[in-house]
A protein has these predicted regions:
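Short, charge/polar-rich alpha-helical segments
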Residues: 1-4
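N-terminal "pre-motor" subdomain/linker immediately upstream of P-loop NTPase catalytic cores
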Residues: 12-124
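Long, compositionally biased regulatory regions of eukaryotic proteins
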Residues: 6-9
Length: 124
């Protein structure tokens, strides 16, 4: 999960990458090829952002993966999907995400940047 500073870097990179990746969309490439292409582009963009160029390797990769999740998957909630104990995910607000496990609701530390980020994921 990204903190607010990393989330801002990620969202800036995704905004810049969206047009480039949409224009270069190739329906014949596999998801792995598409993700690799997005990873390379996002890495270049994050490196060009002053705050991004100062990230340690773990934070850098977390920002890139979050960007790929935003571009092609379910954004910040993607990391919850492998957890088979979760039966429902509810996004009430950018910083108000809940899961249901064994009939119990629990708030999780998953955060979207803002309402526009939530809408971006929904409308994709």
């Amino acid at each position: 999960m990204l903190n607010r500073d990393l989330l801002k870097i990620e969202r800036d990179a995704v905004r810049q990458a969206t047009g480039v990746l949409t224009a270069a969309n190739d329906a014949t490439e596999s998801n792995e090829q598409r993700d690799t292409r997005a990873h390379e582009l996002l890495a270049d963009i994050v490196d060009s952002i002053p705050e991004g160029s100062r990230l340690d390797d773990n934070s850098f990769e977390a920002v890139i993966q979050a960007g790929i999740n935003d571009l092609y998957y379910l954004g910040p909630i993607e990391e919850l999907l492998p957890d088979t104990s979760i039966s429902e995910i509810m996004v009430n607000a950018p910083d108000d995400v809940w899961v249901e496990r064994a009939g119990m609701l629990r708030k999780v530390p998953v955060t979207f940047e803002d309402d526009e980020h939530v809408k971006f994921i929904i409308n994709r």
